[in-house]
Regions:
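A short, well-structured edge-of-sheet supersecondary motif
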Residues: 1-17, 251
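Short glycine-rich, polar/acidic loop-and-turn segments at beta strand-coil junctions
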Residues: 7-9, 27, 38-41, 81
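Short active-site loop at a secondary-structure junction
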Residues: 16-36
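Conserved serine DD-peptidase/penicillin-binding transpeptidase domain
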Residues: 39-291
Length: 291
């Protein structure tokens, strides 16, 4: 156990016990973290996740007076560092990404062809700290955080037995996840099934062992190893669900920051982007800039 208590008035250390060590957070850690945030920022604190657009824009006027926008160029997703923790209400849904896609549709976006950039400059790109239980990495509750998603950094794996063979699938689809059967047995009908996930570090391969009853199905929530690329894939999927025609879309990552004080260094090689659209207000068509 480690503990550090600091006076908010003077800044003096009141109590320190292994204060410099890093530990696996307890399940009640969120209470202290949330309490500290509310004390510092207040319950009315808000921060904006932004989408910026750069490229060639074609506008067309519809008979009903609305304007439709076709963008050929870049979309840049700038997270604010407040990950989405809303309930996942539907298969494949990701609350924040779904909301952004809906705002873009409301603003007139009907077609996108180009590159989706994910700004990774806010959080440090570092491995889990020493002492973290490796067995937790594969499970959904052990999923890594990124500035966009918290409980959304996971997928639901389904193992289904048919004809003596076990097939594996996951939802939502789109993330670059490679599932590998590392020893899933077929048990008698009606037997309780189970799955144990294990990541192959340095890859996007997830090995699964377990047991599936004959003719049955077993499901398990598992973590994604690269939440940034997964968020990009799910954002494009959310755009498609809204009705945006996504053509030949590529995904690119801006460099990760150092995460100093929660404010990572500015990422280098940032593509120039204009027409910033703030999350929270429907993006106006005039917010798109043609270059």
């Amino acid at each position: 156990m480690g503990l550090l208590a600091v006076s908010r008035d003077s800044g003096d250390t009141l109590l320190a016990c292994r204060a410099g060590d890093r530990f696996i957070p307890g399940s009640n850690q969120k209470l202290y973290t949330l309490g500290a945030f509310l004390l510092e920022e207040g319950p009315a604190a808000r921060s904006a996740t932004r989408v910026a657009a750069r490229g060639k824009v074609k506008r067309s006027r519809r008979p009903d007076g609305t304007t439709e926008v076709a963008l050929r160029g870049d979309l840049v997703l700038h997270p604010c560092g407040m990950p989405d923790i809303v309930p996942l209400l539907a298969p494949g849904s990701r609350g924040l990404l779904d909301s952004l896609a809906a705002l873009l549709w409301t603003g007139g976006l009907r077609r996108f062809e180009g590159t989706l950039w994910i700004d990774r400059g806010l959080f440090a790109d570092e491995a889990p700290p020493p002492g973290w239980a490796h067995d937790d990495f594969g499970y959904s509750f052990g999923a890594p955080l990124n500035p966009l998603l918290a409980n959304g950094n996971a997928v639901l794996v389904t193992a289904r037995e048919e004809g003596g063979r076990v097939s594996l699938s996951f939802e939502p689809s789109g993330s670059s996840l490679d599932l590998r059967d590392a020893g899933i047995l077929v048990g008698p009908p009606g037997e309780s099934g189970w799955l144990i996930p294990r990541w192959i570090f340095g890859t996007r391969t997830l090995e699964l062992t377990g047991l599936v009853p004959r003719g049955g199905t077993v499901r398990r929530g598992v973590a994604v190893s690269d939440p940034d690329s997964a968020a990009a894939a799910w954002f494009l999927a959310a755009l498609r669900r809204e009705g945006v025609d996504v053509k030949k879309a590529a995904v690119a990552m801006l460099p990760a920051g150092r995460g100093s004080g929660g404010r990572g260094e500015k990422p280098r090689n940032r593509p120039p982007a204009t027409g910033t659209i703030a999350f929270g207000d429907p993006p106006a068509v005039e917010g798109w800039s043609a270059v």
